[in-house]
Amino acid sequence: MGNCLSASTLPTEPNAPKSVEEGVKVFTVADLKKATNDFGNQMELGESLGYINPKTLSPAKKGVGMAVAVKKIYLANEQAFQDWLVDVEFLRHNSHPSLVKLIGYCYDRDMLFIVSEYFPNGSLGSYISRDSRPKSLPWETRLKISIGAAQCLAFLHSRKQAGLYRRYLTASKILLDSDFNARVSYFGKPKVSLDELVYTIGFSNVAPRYQYPPPEYILSGMSNMAGDVYSFGVILLKMLTGLGKDLTISAKREIKNKKYNIVEMIDPDLKNSYPLEAGRLMCELIKQCLEVDPKMRPTMQEVLDNLNAIAQI
């Protein structure tokens, strides 16, 4: 692989961050190879563990440097990189405690290497399905994760003029630190068309299916902030039931039609460790998020307010 584009040879982008002084570091391939032991510290598909000096952001050794995640992403074209830089510029000026921090990047031909914070507990997606998760999270932790993610989404929606909503929102986009605080990753923005969801930034050239599509997307190919609320509702439903990929259509129908039984719907691993009223209100909130009519769904701020109220029970 060749050298990454330097700050002086980046594709034309007037406000693109070009240095560590501006908050986002432009790395070279050599830097990243050194930081990750030649990309040998694999964590998951396309992602390696690396170490850098927290002050200079130069490569460092394990035990000395700060742990970072280095993600390799294939780009459809240079325009995809230009689009990504627009998001980077916005996020440099609109940080949020529940939003994953971008440390730097490297752009080389059709590949983008993203250097971001390292999250030792991985993603929420690993903890949802009770058949495959490493451990069951207690009610309080699940609620804390939900609130953290909702805080970030409400923040992004409040900055809607920047076009940062309509994320490809899944449980794997919600990352967990050592204390299980949630941070939402914005990496991998999709381009939505009428016929399919096509990644402008993705792990392969195969277009993935929209995992949590709101009804309006299925009907028209269009979605907006209300679509985010629907997708978040699906995530809450999976967290509540522990069913993960095995979430049944009947379970969704039950909770939509208010024909749910709290004891039967909520993850049995939680047993009697949650307040029944909190469980009932969570079910009601999920039902509202999954409304077929997008106008009937709450805003993300209203979702956040409801989650905070549930946490007080």
UniProtKB/Swiss-Prot annotation:
PROSITE patterns named among the record's database cross-references: PROTEIN_KINASE_DOM
Keyword Lipoprotein annotated: yes
Lipid moiety-binding residues (N-myristoyl glycine): 2
Location of this chain's protein in the cell: Cell membrane
Domain Protein kinase: 43-311
Binding-site residues, ATP: 49-57, 71
Modifications after synthesis and translation: N-terminal myristoylation is critical for plasma membrane localization and implication in defense responses.
Disruption phenotype: Partial suppression of the pleiotropic phenotypes conferred by the dominant mutation zed1-D (e.g. high-temperature-dependent growth retardation and autoimmunity).
GO molecular function: ATP binding; protein kinase activity
Main location: membrane
Effect of residue 2 to A: Abolished N-terminal myristoylation leading to disrupted plasma membrane localization and inhability to suppress zed1-D-activated immunity. Lost ability to trigger hypersensitive response (HR)
Membrane topology per record: Lipid-anchor
GO-annotated cellular components: cytoplasm; nucleus; plasma membrane; plasmodesma
Enzyme Commission code: 2.7.11.1
InterPro entries: Kinase-like_dom_sf, Plant_Ser_Thr_Prot_Kinase, Prot_kinase_dom, Ser-Thr/Tyr_kinase_cat_dom
Catalytic activities: L-seryl-[protein] + ATP = O-phospho-L-seryl-[protein] + ADP + H(+); L-threonyl-[protein] + ATP = O-phospho-L-threonyl-[protein] + ADP + H(+)
GO biological process, one term: positive regulation of defense response to bacterium
Entry comment describing in which tissues the protein is expressed: Expressed in roots, seedlings, rosette leaves, floral organs, siliques and inflorescence stems.
Alphabetically ordered keywords of this record: ATP-binding, Cell membrane, Kinase, Lipoprotein, Membrane, Myristate, Nucleotide-binding, Phosphoprotein, Plant defense, Transferase
Quaternary organization: Component of an immune signaling complex made of, at least, SZE1, BKN2/SZE2, ZAR1 and ZED1. Interacts directly with ZED1, ZAR1 and Pseudomonas syringae HOPZ1A at the plasma membrane.
Primary role: Together with BKN2/SZE2 and ZED1, required for effector-triggered immunity (e.g. Pseudomonas syringae effector type III HopZ1a) via the activation of ZAR1, thus being essential for resistance against P.syringae pv. tomato DC3000 expressing HopZ1a.
Family per similarity comment: Belongs to the protein kinase superfamily. Ser/Thr protein kinase family.
Protein name: Serine/threonine-protein kinase SZE1
Organism: Arabidopsis thaliana (Mouse-ear cress)
Taxonomic placement: Eukaryota, Viridiplantae, Streptophyta, Embryophyta, Tracheophyta
